Amino acid sequence: MTSRPQIHVHDAKEANKQTATKLTLPAVFTAPIRTDIVHKVFTDLNKNRKQASGVKISTRGTAGMGHSAESWGTGRAVARIPRVGGSGTHRSGQAAFGNQCRKGRMFAPLKTYRRVHRRVNVNQKRHAVAAALAASALVPLVFARGHRISNVQELPYVFDDSVESYEKTKQAVAFLKRVGAYDDVLRVAETKALRAGQGKLRNRRYKLRRGPLVVYGNEKSTLTRALRNIPGVDVCNVNRLNLLQLAPGGHVGRFIIWTESAFKKLNEIFGTYSTTGVQKSGYQLQRPLLANADIARIINSNEVQSVVKVAGTTETHERKKNPLTNNNALFKLNPAAKIVKEQAKKAAEASKAKRQATLKANRKAAKTHKKGSQAWIAAFNKANEEAIAKARQEDADFIAQGQEIKEGDE
C-alpha cells in the first residue's frame, strides 16, 4: 500500500508544475491488493460481453443434417453409419450425419441457450475494483504491467479540472506530452498488429495494448471526445469505474490519470475503514490482514521473541552400520582389515598385469606363427605351380614327339 498521506494536484497547462492544492489520499488506495479476487471477477465479467452463438438451425434441419440418408444395416461388411441414397453420383452411398463424416454435423452441436454469462456478487466486484485502484498507486506494479512512466512525477497522478474542458484531440495530445504520459501512448502505437483468425472480418481487424486510463468527474465533460481517437487511451467516469478497464486481462497496475473532481469523489464512493460508501450503499472496504507487512520486523520484535520457545538440544543417536557391508565400520572395528584389503587389491592388480603380459606375448607369438605359415603356404603353392607347369610341358613335348613319329611312318 502507499504510505504518502497527501497527493499533489498538478497543473495541466504547464509541465512539472504543482498547484497549491493538496488532497488527502483516499482510503481505497490503501485497500489490500487481492489479485485472486481481481482475476476471478475479471474472468466472469469478461464473459458477459459474449453474444449467444451456436450451430445454424433452419427449416431444413440443423447444419450437417440436411440429407436423406438411412443406415444399410448389417450384412454388407460396411459401417452402420447412415448413407445417402440414390445412384449415378459420387454422393450416393457416402456416409452422412456423423461428426466423422464429410459434410456431417459436429459432435454435440452448440446451442444458443448455453450458459455463457456469469453472475458476480456485487460486493465481490467492489472488492476487485478497490484492489485494482490500490495497485494503480504502486509504481512497481505499474512498471511491471509494461507502462512507460519514467517521466511521470508521482502516482496517483492528479490534475486540475481544466483537463475536463478539452474538446480537441490536439489539446489532449499536447497535455499527454506535457505530463510525460505520451511515452506510454507511443508504446501502444508500436504494438498495433493484424488480428489472427476470423475476428479481422468482424470489425476487430487490429489489436493493440492498453495505455493510460483517464478518469474524470464531471458528467458533462467533453474530455471523452478529445481522447477517443488516441490509441490505447481509455476514458471512464469516476462513478462508473469498471474492472475491465482498471485491470485489463485481470492484471493489476494500470496507469491512471485523475482529475481533481474525480479524485475527491473516491471517499464518497468507496467510503473509508470507519464509514461506508454513500454511492455504494453499505459497502465497507476490506481491512488488511497485516497492518505491517514487514515480517522480519514482526518476528524480531520484543513481543514475539519474549514468548518464542527457546531452542532445545536434540538427542542424536549414532546410526548402526553393518561392518560386513560397510568398509568404514569394518576398519573401525578391525584396523588390520584395511591392510588385508589393500594387499589383496595389490595382488589382484599384479595378477591382472601378469595375465595381460602373458596374453600380449601369446598374441605376438600367434601373429608371428601366422606370418610364417602364410610364407610357407605361399612357397608351397609356388613350387606346386612350377611342378604342374613342368609336368604339362613334358606332356606337351611327349605328344608333339608322338605326332612327328606318326607323320614319318606315313
UniProtKB/Swiss-Prot annotation:
One of its GO terms (biological process) is translation. GO terms for molecular function: structural constituent of ribosome. The keyword Transmembrane helix does not apply. One of its GO terms (cellular component) is ribosome. The keyword Ribonucleoprotein applies. Pfam families: Ribos_L4_asso_C (PF14374), Ribosomal_L4 (PF00573). Keywords: Cytoplasm, Ribonucleoprotein, Ribosomal protein. It is found in: Cytoplasm. Coiled coil: none annotated. PANTHER family: 60S RIBOSOMAL PROTEIN L4 (PTHR19431). Belongs to the universal ribosomal protein uL4 family. This is Large ribosomal subunit protein uL4. It comes from Tetrahymena thermophila (strain SB210). The lineage of its organism: Eukaryota, Sar, Alveolata, Ciliophora, Intramacronucleata.
